């Protein structure tokens, strides 16, 4: 166990690894790219990321496309393209909710769990998103809450949804 000082000077909310020594770290005040060297973290300036002023709630790094998908509290979801060094905004406004989790659905799509707008699906290449699983209050046999805490996809491709306050929905 090695305790490191927090060079980010902010509460760390999410971590994604890029390679053996580089990481993205989300905080309650923004996002940083860091390098682990000699058992210390060094901040690596990346201008597009350094400008993000948002509470980061969830991160997902897609190795093949070299894109970091960033979920925030009340600022929506967007992607950072490492190769082009630019931020790409999603077409769907998710700025009223917290992005609780970002998980891969398949080779080209991610699921975005929100606290208030159900689950959205986003294409990793185009960053176009759409509602995917939302509650239906008219039926008792469907998901009955749009407040999603977590999602998990098992080997059989079933989607497990931890929704508040009801518990688990499996689709």
Per-region residue spans from a language model:
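Carboxylate-rich, polar loop motifs that coordinate divalent cations or form catalytic acidic clusters
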Residues: 1-171
């Amino acid at each position: 166990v090695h305790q490191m000082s927090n060079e980010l000077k902010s509460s760390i909310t999410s971590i994604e690894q890029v390679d053996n020594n580089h990481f993205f770290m989300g905080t309650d005040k923004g996002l940083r790219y860091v390098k682990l060297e000699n058992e210390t973290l060094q901040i690596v300036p990346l201008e597009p990321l350094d400008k993000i002023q948002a509470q980061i709630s969830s991160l997902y790094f897609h190795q093949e496309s070299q894109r970091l998908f960033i979920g925030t509290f009340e600022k929506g979801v967007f992607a950072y393209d490492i190769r082009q060094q630019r931020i790409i905004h999603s077409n769907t406004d998710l700025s009223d909710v917290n992005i609780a989790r970002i998980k891969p659905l398949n080779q080209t799509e991610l699921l975005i769990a929100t606290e208030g707008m159900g689950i959205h699906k986003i294409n990793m290449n185009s960053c176009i998103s759409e509602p995917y699983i939302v509650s239906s209050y008219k039926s008792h046999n469907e998901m009955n809450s749009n407040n999603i805490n977590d999602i998990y996809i098992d080997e059989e491709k079933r989607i497990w949804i931890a929704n508040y306050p009801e518990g688990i929905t499996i689709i």
